[in-house]
A protein has these predicted regions:
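Active-site glycine-centered loops adjacent to acidic/histidine catalytic or metal-binding residues
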Residues: 67, 93, 267
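Short beta-strand scaffold segments in enzyme catalytic cores
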Residues: 97-101
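Structural signature of FAD isoalloxazine-binding scaffolds in flavoprotein oxidoreductases
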Residues: 113-116
């Protein structure tokens, strides 16, 4: 993997002037901004150090940052989180990553793995997570959870399953995009799956609000394509589960500005210092 990254950098360097190298990766990154402590959703990354290996080849500043932290930074500096303090970011994909900015700085914690919101345990002895624990919110509010909810309902009701499959691709498989399209057309299974996912995420937002009192919670990743169809039930669920409801101002829940390139934008800005 590192060799492939080095080859890619060489290709860019042959065509462009490069001032630094910022890498966004879906993994826990230690505070040295180089060593990978763990990667629940990507095999064989643990203990790799991108920075030390790449620095041997290029005489340039190099940093590696958790993808959600990098995306959080992009939204804070240039996107829909600009000027907000504190602000939380969730990236909802295969897993569920998190980032946090307090007083204009990324919060990394003592060793660098802080704000890993996707691994808050919400269900004791719940679904096994890639991190090795059980019942992490990632297993209930991620894109993978969305797919699981849909498939469970398809299995329980074959007639409704056929209706959903009308929105599938040529292979007959369903995807997050399939569910988004179907939900926008009012498909029962797709809407139910999104509502279950939103309920869990709203529950988590309520807990994080009491912990950090953010001005806003920004949501990125593929679920943003569903728009208010997803965000509205997240807000409703947050209010439903909010402790001390009515005694404080709830955070805004808003969609991220940037899509899949958010991590790249954030990493590029972070390496500039």
């Amino acid at each position: 993997l590192i060799a492939a990254i080095i080859d890619l950098i060489k290709e860019f360097k042959s065509k462009h002037e490069i001032a630094g190298i910022g890498i966004s990766v879906a993994a826990l990154i230690l505070k040295d901004q180089g060593t990978i402590a763990g990667a629940p959703n990507i095999a064989n990354l643990s203990q790799l150090n991108f920075v030390s290996e790449i620095s041997k080849v290029f005489n340039l500043p190099v940093i590696a940052e958790n993808d959600a932290n990098a995306a959080m930074w992009a939204e804070f500096k240039f996107g829909n989180a600009h000027g907000l303090n504190p602000v939380i970011f969730f990236i909802i994909g295969t897993g569920m990553g998190g980032g946090l900015v307090i007083d204009g700085k990324l919060f990394r914690g003592a060793s660098g793995i802080g704000a890993e919101f996707g691994h808050m345990i919400v269900e004791r002895d719940g679904v096994l997570c890639g991190c090795g624990s059980h019942g992490c919110i990632e297993q209930y509010a991620s894109g993978s959870a969305l797919m699981r909810y849909a498939k469970e309902e398809m299995k329980a009701d074959p007639i409704k399953a056929k209706e959903l499959l009308k929105y599938s691709d040529a292979s007959g498989d369903i995807s997050g995009a399939t569910l988004t399209t179907a939900a926008k057309q009012g498909n029962e299974i797709a809407l139910s799956a999104f509502n279950k996912q939103a309920d869990w995420l709203g529950n988590a937002c309520a807990s994080y609000t009491l912990l950090l009192d953010p001005q806003a919670i920004v949501i990125g990743g593929g679920v943003v394509d569903a728009g208010e169809l997803f965000l509205t039930p997240v807000r409703s669920a947050m209010e439903k589960y909010m402790p001390f409801a009515g005694t404080h101002t709830s955070p805004k829940i808003i969609a991220a500005k940037f899509g899949n390139e958010a991590g790249l934008i954030g990493a590029a800005d972070l390496v500039r210092g």
